[in-house]
Amino acid sequence: MHHVQEARHAPAVELGASIVDIEIGTTKLTPAMNLIKGRASCLVSHHDFQGTPPIEGLEEIVRREISAGADICKVVTTANSPDDNLTMLQLIARFPQVRLVSLAMGNLGLASRILCPMAGGDFTYASIERDKESAPGQITVSELVKIYQMVGAWGTET
């Protein structure tokens, strides 16, 4: 997946990206999406690096992403409380027909990262190796697989 902030970065599709992440606040969102649509899935994202707003505000963000034409919606906040995990998972439940990634960053957001796909979210994020994380609180793929295996959410053949 490639992250696009301006239409000039759309060549990610030429590099073989199957999903391109475009921030909802991108000034040239529509032209960027027009370059991508039909060639890759458009993931329209929102990141809040300060905290986790009330669920009503998060719902409005998802509605804006849907209106923008997102194939996949992504809402990522920063957990300042363990309760923020529940808020992010509740967001998934409120949009059952939408491909949605909803999780919280930071150490306090770990539960939402792990549970997002188990709660109906489209997928989650993990780093390939330690110290290569793309966001605070991200765990490695191998750690995530071990957790999923322990709770019976992943086959043991890995």
Question: Residue locations for each model-derived region?
Answer:
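Short, acidic/polar
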Residues: M1-P11, P54-R64
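Active-site-adjacent beta->alpha loops and helix N-cap segments on the catalytic face
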Residues: I24-R39, P53-G57, N80-R94, L110-A111
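Generic hydrophobic/aromatic pocket-lining and core-packing "Φ" positions
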Residues: H9, A32-M33, V62, R113
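Glycine-enriched alpha-helix->loop->beta-strand junction motifs that scaffold or abut catalytic
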Residues: E14-I19, L35-V44, I66-I72, F95-V98, ...
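Ligand-binding grooves and catalytic loops that recognize ribose/phosphate and carbohydrate rings
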Residues: E56-I72, E143-I147
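Catalytic beta/alpha-barrel core
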Residues: H9-L29, L43-P54, D71-S81, V101-A104
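Short, contiguous clusters of charged residues that form electrostatic/catalytic patches at enzyme active sites
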Residues: A7, E60, L86, Q90, ...
